[in-house]
């Protein structure tokens, strides 16, 4: 987006309001979502989380040993490809994080919208990563993982529940179980968690979701294809 334009102003205000550490607009559920999918580098990480979800939803599908190997290879491959795509994009465009924009750079955008103003005391709800914002790694990993699992199962419509693997790191997540009616719903929630957490712009999420799905579609069509 043009940082002086209305689309940027809307995204700036959205993350400023919802993603602040002391936000009064973020709901309890949105706060839970931000923590549930945080998956920082000191824990399971997003690729590890989606490998765990894959194991959970595939374990009762009566897969053979070879089918299991194929599934894990495809899912692992797409997670690796997602990281390459996302981080290549991050350092190609070098877009600043919301926390930097809100605390330091807002006046430089020359945006006439009064919502685009500097707040030196603003803090993100979850820790802001130390690398560029665009696009979202979380959203790329999530979309790629969910799409590949859907390819393997032949459907996106999977009802499942899941507990966070980061309960030691985030004790507030103990006994918290989240429920979804589709794999894509879980992937979108995973990506939106970064807006609720104050570390990504909405555009980071939306573009990354499309990239992740494309990565999975390409890998499924070309690699480890079943023998007829």
Residue spans for each PLM region:
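Acidic/polar surface patches and capping/hinge elements
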Residues: 1-228
């Amino acid at each position: 987006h043009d940082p002086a334009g209305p689309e940027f102003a809307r995204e700036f205000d959205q993350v400023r309001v919802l993603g602040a550490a002391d936000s009064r607009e973020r709901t309890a559920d949105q706060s839970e979502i931000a923590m549930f999918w945080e998956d920082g580098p000191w824990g399971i990480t997003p690729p590890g989380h989606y490998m765990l979800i894959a194991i959970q939803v595939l374990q009762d599908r009566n897969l053979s040993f070879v089918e299991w190997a194929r599934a894990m290879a495809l899912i692992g491959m797409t997670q690796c490809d997602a990281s390459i795509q996302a981080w290549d994009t991050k350092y190609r465009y070098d877009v600043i994080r919301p926390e930097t924009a809100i605390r330091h750079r807002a006046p430089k955008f020359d945006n006439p919208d009064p919502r685009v103003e500097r707040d030196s005391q603003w803090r993100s709800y979850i820790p802001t990563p130390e690398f560029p914002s665009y696009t979202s790694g979380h959203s790329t990993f999530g979309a790629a993982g969910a799409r590949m699992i859907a390819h393997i199962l032949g459907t996106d419509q999977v009802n499942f529940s899941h507990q966070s693997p980061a309960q030691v790191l985030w004790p507030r997540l103990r006994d918290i179980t989240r429920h979804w009616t589709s794999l894509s719903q879980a992937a979108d929630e995973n990506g939106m968690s970064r807006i609720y957490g104050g570390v990504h712009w909405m555009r980071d999420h939306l573009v990354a979701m499309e990239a992740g799905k494309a990565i999975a579609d390409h890998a499924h069509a070309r690699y480890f294809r079943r023998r007829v």
